[in-house]
Amino acid sequence: MPSVAVSSDVSIAYESFGDPGDPPVLLVMGFGAQMLAWHEDFCRALADRGRYVIRYDNRDCGLSTKFDEHPVDMGRFIAAVSSGDFPAALAMVPYRLRDMADDGLGLLTALGIERAHVVGASMGGMIAQTMALSFPERVLTLTSMMSSTGESAYGQSSPEAQAVLFAPKPADRAGYVAAAGKELAWASQRYGDAAALRELAAASYDRAYYPAGIGRQLGAMVLSGSRADALRELRVPTLVIHGLDDTLIDPSGGRRTAELVPGAELLLVPDMGHDRPRELWPDLIDAVVSHTA
């Protein structure tokens, strides 16, 4: 997969699908997940509907630049945040969501794309929101999927989902792949597919196993704060999609996002958790195609 320099110290790995002459759609993935989490079949199906689809690895993930020179001790970081020692927490994390948003926009620049439709899932939704807030002239439309506003009162995880998210991941391939089945904790209750979760985990492990980046991405997310006031002023056409089965980011996160952004459309999806089950792809793709028309 190709990679391009988006700044003096960051290169981003990406893959594109479809005709470059079609309207560009940038897919932004979430916390700790590689571009593979935007399934290739999903990307091709969206491209077949007349969109030029670009997926990419965020910094500190996949084949993009790693920040090994800034190790984060998760225990110390969580203790600092929990105790309110934000100066100490801030000093541990080398970047914020704004930097991750700049990476995505830098990728578009490197590809010669001035403006694009931006679709972000989970933390990727937060990054996509930040793109639209920081450079609205470059974002044709925003689709914020299974995400939230950065306000602590909305989009909270259930204790069960949080326990799975922060459980230590096995370092060996077999253990890592087996543990992925536990992500059913936040998946669609109807369509949750442990085999598909393990298949993605195996592909991700083989491509670029890199647990060290998770702490820095978490820090960027936690320390970037609330976007609520800024979202009230956003004028980019916005679609908010959230699964009603989501226990990792409660649907209140999506509802709140749509409440804040003037004119935003809210699509609450039954039988969808913090995932994109293949059975729901037609509905999700229809929604994105309609919003980006």
What residues fall within each predicted segment?
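Conserved alpha/beta-hydrolase catalytic His-Asp/Glu region
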Residues: 175-216
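Acidic catalytic loop of the alpha/beta-hydrolase fold
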Residues: 245-249
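Short beta-strand/loop motif that positions the catalytic acidic residue
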Residues: 234, 240-242
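Flexible "cap/lid" loop of the alpha/beta hydrolase fold
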Residues: 142-171
